[in-house]
Amino acid sequence: MEAYHKPDQQKLQALKDTANRLRISSIQATTAAGSGHPTSCCSAAEIMAVLFFHTMRYKALDPRNPHNDRFVLSKGHAAPILYAVWAEAGFLPESELLNLRKINSDLDGHPVPKQAFTDVATGSLGQGLGAACGMAYTGKYFDKASYRVYCMLGDGELSEGSVWEAMAFASIYKLDNLVAILDINRLGQSDPAPLQHQMDIYQKRCEAFGWNAVIVDGHSVEELCKAFGQVKNQPTAIIAKTFKGRGITGIEDKESWHGKPLPKNMADQIIQEISGQIQSKKKILATPPEEDAPSVDITNIRMPTPPNYKVGDKIATRKAYGQALAKLGHASNRIIALDGDTKNSTFSELFKKEHPDRFIECYIAEQNMVSIAVGCATRDRTVPFCSTFAAFFTRAFDQIRMAAISESNINLCGSHCGVSIGEDGPSQMALEDLAMFRSIPMSTVFYPSDGVATEKAVELAANTKGICFIRTSRPENAIIYKQHEDFQIGQAKVVLKNKDDQVTVIGAGVTLHEALAAADLLKREKINIRVLDPFTIKPLDKKLILDSARATKGRILTVEDHYYEGGIGEAVASAVVGEPGVTVTRLAVSQVPRSGKPAELLKMFGIDRDAIAQAVRGLVTRA
């Protein structure tokens, strides 16, 4: 970035005029919509004008060009001013702004990626900076390109802990290509923000987190130009003192106007007042970027060799995940791994050992880790794999939910699922994760049961759009598949089959192996069962499940190391509901567990081989 040169008076006036046009557009759009946040837009007008028409480098007619500077509107409720910017730049027709929030318009109430200029969906506050950190990390360390990343936050969202997780991350990794703009307009939604206009405290907090922090008058285009022109070898926070509703007579800096459009008669009067301050209608052209981002292809990434496991060998699927990811890393230098300080448990350390420059340690900040991954994945620059204990992904549920709204392609591996982890106890046991990930739109939920299946899951996830979750286990279990076994999403496997099977038993991970052990017990009693491995819990192989059920007198037994709610049993029951003559019996963890040996806990909660065998006997004798 070049050293700061003060713009001449003509440019400064043009920026003031641009800011006022953005104000007018925001007021017009929200009044036409009958809803929206004009006051939140008006506090940011000068910031947005200086950013997009003085500081940033981008191609106005190609918003997703990989060379462009990036912008994240973390305070997503100010979407109308973002849309106004892209109309001012010439990408959107100005008439489209009046379709804000209409069902047939792409201009939603908050930014979403169906808009070409939006990389990540925002509106659930506190998440934009984490995504911006992921973009900046990618720009600095993977692309090694000159594009910069800007993120505007509101003061209300600075109460979110995830913001400070991101602040810490940016400092640790010296993201000097990242600028956060804090729009300190004093007022939150229902009350003033906790610090109101105590700018020095904001500055001290940012500096304490390792940022270069600059206080500016957020309505002075000259001060903003100077602040954006400062170059430091650390991330920069521009702390802008602004006023909510700036330029709206009678409403500026007044409470109780959050999220309220102006009535038409008031809007017309205010627009007339603001228009009177505009000296020229001439628009400022966007400055094009330096074109130094490498071309990237993340399609069709395949394992270099087949799985190197032999049937009967034992390995935990969590370790097989680490080995698979390290292996896939050799197929593409755009495979990256992130972990939350659990890499020696999730085995992502194996990836770090072989590809140290593509491993991102996110420390114990799971919410931020997911946001970082979302940022890294934008514009198809990388294929991220995040790992931690599956239980700890639950604290990032909102980030995962927003990742789906962002149409992000990220892969999450949750280890240590279920009571089978043993002595560590319930705080470490994932028993809700399947329910959580199944509820995410367009998600794919893998639950591999051996090393071969795990390796295939990793490869498939890398090439699958949307949120992919891979559930791995702590216990070592036998390899049951040959190395060339073909796996596909939504395709279950019949692991054990006889002509006279009495019950179809569906298990995954540890419980699949317990089902196979139960089959041996039952065989001595001349009771045969069919054992299915679903491989993906979402989508589920409904056809194979129904075919198997019909071949076993309509009896299905599911067994899972998960709570009853939202897991395999409910997925299977939903798939076969309404099918005549088909019944589903479920075995799952029924209450909060405790510490103990894995075998003791499986037995205590009725999901071990003996419980499966007993349930099968009950189904057979009931006929």
Curated annotation (Swiss-Prot):
Functional note: Catalyzes the transfer of a two-carbon ketol group from a ketose donor to an aldose acceptor, via a covalent intermediate with the cofactor thiamine pyrophosphate.
Catalytic activity: D-sedoheptulose 7-phosphate + D-glyceraldehyde 3-phosphate = aldehydo-D-ribose 5-phosphate + D-xylulose 5-phosphate
Co-factor note (free text): Binds 1 Mg(2+) ion per subunit. Can also utilize other divalent metal cations, such as Ca(2+), Mn(2+) and Co(2+). Binds 1 thiamine pyrophosphate per subunit.
Modified residue annotations for Phosphoserine: 295, 345
Phosphoprotein found in the keyword field: yes
UniProt keyword Calcium, yes or no: yes
Site entry: Important for catalytic activity: 37, 258
Residues the record lists as Phosphothreonine modifications: 287
Family under the similarity heading: Belongs to the transketolase family.
Lineage of the organism: Eukaryota, Metazoa, Chordata, Craniata, Vertebrata
Keyword vocabulary terms for this entry: Acetylation, Calcium, Isopeptide bond, Magnesium, Metal-binding, Phosphoprotein, Thiamine pyrophosphate, Transferase, Ubl conjugation
Protein name per its UniProtKB record: Transketolase
GO molecular function, one term: metal ion binding
Residue sites binding Mg(2+) per the record: 155, 185, 187
Gene (UniProt): TKT
Entry-annotated residues carrying N-acetylmethionine: 1
List of residues that carry N6-acetyllysine: 6, 11, 144, 204, 232, 241, 260, 538, 603
Active site per the UniProt annotation: 366
GO biological process: pentose-phosphate shunt, non-oxidative branch; regulation of growth
Enzyme class: transferase
Pfam families: Transket_pyr (PF02779), Transketolase_C (PF02780), Transketolase_N (PF00456)
